[in-house]
Amino acid sequence: MSKKVLFIDRDGTLINEPLDNFQIDRIEKLVLEPYVINALLILQQANFQLVMVSNQDGLGTSSFPQEDFDRPHNLMMQIFKSQNIFFDQVLICPHLAKDKCHCRKPGIALVAPWLVGNKIDRTKSYVIGDRETDIKLAYNMGINSLRYNRNTMNWQAICNYLTSLNRYAHVKRITKETSINVEVWLDREAPSKINTGINFFDHMLEQIATHSGLCMTIEVKGDLYIDDHHTIEDTAIALGTALKQGLGDKHGINRFGFLLPMDECLARCVIDLSGRPFLEYTAEYSYQKVGDMSTEMVEHFFRSLSYAMACTLYLKTEGKNDHHRVESLFKVFGRALRQAICVESNVLPSSKGVLS
C-alpha cells in the first residue's frame, strides 16, 4: 500500500531559523518551533511517515564547517528520538544556489527515490515548509503542500488539518459492457449524484448514501438495451472498490456493524470489514422486477459489492411488499456501514495487525 509521507523542512519549520546568518551552527541557537513535538507524535500515530528535507548553504565549507552543523543537528535528532519521533530519512543539500545542482530545493533529486512507482500516496502526502521553495518542491513532486507560519499555520493548525477525517476514493471502471465513474467521500454528508440509467437502482443507491452518512457520485453508461445485469454488477464492483480504497488501512474504524430495524419489513444486516469477502443472503420476492430493476440482481449486487469491498456481509429481510423488502436491505446495509466505518481511535481493530 502507498505510504502517507510528510517531507518536512528543517530551519524555520522544525526549529527556529536565526536571522543573523540563517545557520544553526551552535547548540545555543537550537530552538524547537512551538508545538512541534506533540504535533509530530500525533501525525506519526495517524500513520504519516516523516522525511526531513533541508537546504544547508555551503555545508562542509569554511563558511559552514560540517562539525558546526553536526553538533546542534545531532542534539535535535536526539531530542526527537527521546520523544519517540523518528524520521525515515534526513535529506540535506549542501550546495549554494549558484552551484545550480539538482538536489537543492525546489529540485527533486534528493526525494526522487520516493517518487518511484506507487511508493507514496500522492493525494495524502505533503511538503511542509516555511519558504516558497518548499511549495515549489511539492509542486514538482506532484503532491500537496502546507506553508508553515508560526502565527497563521503553526504545528497545531497543521496537525488539526492533517488529522481531520477526509477519506475519499475515485474509481473508474471501463469494460466492453459498461463505463463507470465512482467517487466516495466517507466523511462528508452531502447530496449524492447518482445516474445508472436504472431509476429504482438509483433510488436504492441513494438509500446507502443517506443511511451510511457518506456522499457518492456515480455515473454509469451500460448496455441496458440487453438487460440490467452488467450495469448493476459493475456498479457494485466499482462502488465496493471505492469504499475499500477510501477506508485505507482501516486504523481506528469500528470494523463491525449490526442493525435490526423494525418497519413494514424486518431487515437484518451484520457487516465485518475483515478483508475476507463473504455473503449470506436471505430474501424472497413475488415478482421479477421492482420498477425497472430485476429483483434477482439485488443479491448479485451485494455479492459483487462484498467481494470488491472485501467484507463479510449477512443480509436478511422479511415482509410482504417487494419494494419495501428490497429497500429495507439497502437501508439496513447503509446503517450498518455507518457503524463499521466510524473512526473512534488510532488502533487497528485486529489482533493480526492487518485488515487487508
From Swiss-Prot:
Its EC number is 3.1.3.15, 4.2.1.19. It comes from Baumannia cicadellinicola subsp. Homalodisca coagulata. SUPFAM superfamilies: HAD-like (SSF56784), Ribosomal protein S5 domain 2-like (SSF54211). Keywords: Amino-acid biosynthesis, Cytoplasm, Histidine biosynthesis, Hydrolase, Lyase, Magnesium, Metal-binding, Multifunctional enzyme, Zinc. Zn(2+) binds at residues 93, 95, 101, 103. GO terms for biological process: L-histidine biosynthetic process. The gene is hisB. It catalyses: D-erythro-1-(imidazol-4-yl)glycerol 3-phosphate = 3-(imidazol-4-yl)-2-oxopropyl phosphate + H2O; L-histidinol phosphate + H2O = L-histidinol + phosphate. One of its GO terms (cellular component) is cytoplasm. The active site is at 9 (nucleophile), 11 (proton donor). Pathway: Amino-acid biosynthesis; L-histidine biosynthesis; L-histidine from 5-phospho-alpha-D-ribose 1-diphosphate: step 6/9; Amino-acid biosynthesis; L-histidine biosynthesis; L-histidine from 5-phospho-alpha-D-ribose 1-diphosphate: step 8/9. Residues 167-356 are annotated as: Imidazoleglycerol-phosphate dehydratase. Gene3D superfamilies: HAD superfamily/HAD-like (3.40.50.1000), Imidazole glycerol phosphate dehydratase, domain 1 (3.30.230.40). Its cofactor is Mg(2+); Zn(2+). This is Histidine biosynthesis bifunctional protein HisB. Residues 1-166 are annotated as: Histidinol-phosphatase. It is found in: Cytoplasm.
